[in-house]
From Swiss-Prot:
Residues 81-176 form the Toprim domain. Coiled coil: none annotated. PANTHER family: RECOMBINATION PROTEIN RECR. This is Recombination protein RecR. NCBIfam families: recR (TIGR00615). HAMAP family: RecR. InterPro entries: DNA_Rcmb_RecR, Rcmb_RecR, Rcmb_RecR_Znf, TOPRIM_dom, TOPRIM_RecR. GO terms for biological process: DNA recombination; DNA repair. Keywords: DNA damage, DNA recombination, DNA repair, Metal-binding, Zinc, Zinc-finger. A zinc finger (C4-type) spans 57-72. It comes from Escherichia coli O17:K52:H18 (strain UMN026 / ExPEC). May play a role in DNA repair. It seems to be involved in an RecBC-independent recombinational process of DNA repair. It may act with RecF and RecO. The gene is recR.
Length: 201
């Protein structure tokens, strides 16, 4: 069936979103064109600005349009002395919604995976080590996902913390093994943060 090249292009572009297949992309495209063109324009403008203006925080590596994000630049957060290490910026949103953590973060943008060629420097551990050496950090809370790779990454970081005399703790189990942190409900995540345990070598 022959369709508008622009319509086909729009549907193909929408398929880059997670969980969006051909049918979902088609439904989205027709909805925007048929019922909500102004919403489509707002979406296009927001996407264009986000893609061109959002970068990474110089301290924690999360997404921000500033050099340093609002959390890292907050004096009360700086005085806290705790850093929570997570795998993705989405994990920060999940933890912030619990209201249980008042420190700062460090985003790995992934996890260690030697089979995929992902080493310590690829997930910013050189920057984390620099922060451990230069800043007054009292505790690093390891909130990587409870997967094999996440556990290996947490253990590697715990060893790094030990070299600088910084206490390392792991969030308590309760987060489903093999799950993704951003998908966990707030109550479970609150219990996990409150019941974190120290990692000793």
């Amino acid at each position: 069936m022959q369709t508008s090249p622009l319509l086909t292009q729009l549907m193909e572009a929408l398929r880059c979103l997670p969980g969006v297949g051909p049918k979902s992309a088609q439904r989205m495209a027709f909805t925007l064109l048929q019922r909500d063109r102004s919403g489509g324009m707002r979406l296009a403008q927001a996407l264009t600005r986000a893609m061109s203006e959002i970068g990474h925080c110089a301290d924690c590596r999360t997404f921000t349009e500033q050099e340093v994000c609002n959390i890292c630049s907050n004096p009360r957060r700086q005085e806290n002395g705790q850093i929570c290490v997570v795998e993705s910026p989405a994990d920060i949103y999940a933890i912030e919604q619990t209201g249980q953590f008042s420190g700062r973060y460090f985003v790995l943008m992934g996890h260690l995976s030697p089979l995929d060629g992902i080493g310590p420097d690829d997930i910013g551990l050189d920057r984390l080590e620099q922060r451990l050496a230069e800043e007054k950090i009292t505790e690093v809370i390891l909130a990587t996902n409870p997967t094999v790779e996440g556990e290996a990454t947490a253990n590697y970081i715990a060893e790094l913390c030990a070299q600088y005399g910084v206490e390392a703790s792991r969030i308590a189990h309760g987060v489903p093994v093999g799950g993704e942190l951003e998908m966990v409900d707030g109550t479970t995540l609150s219990h996990s943060l409150a019941g974190r345990h120290k990692i000793r070598f």
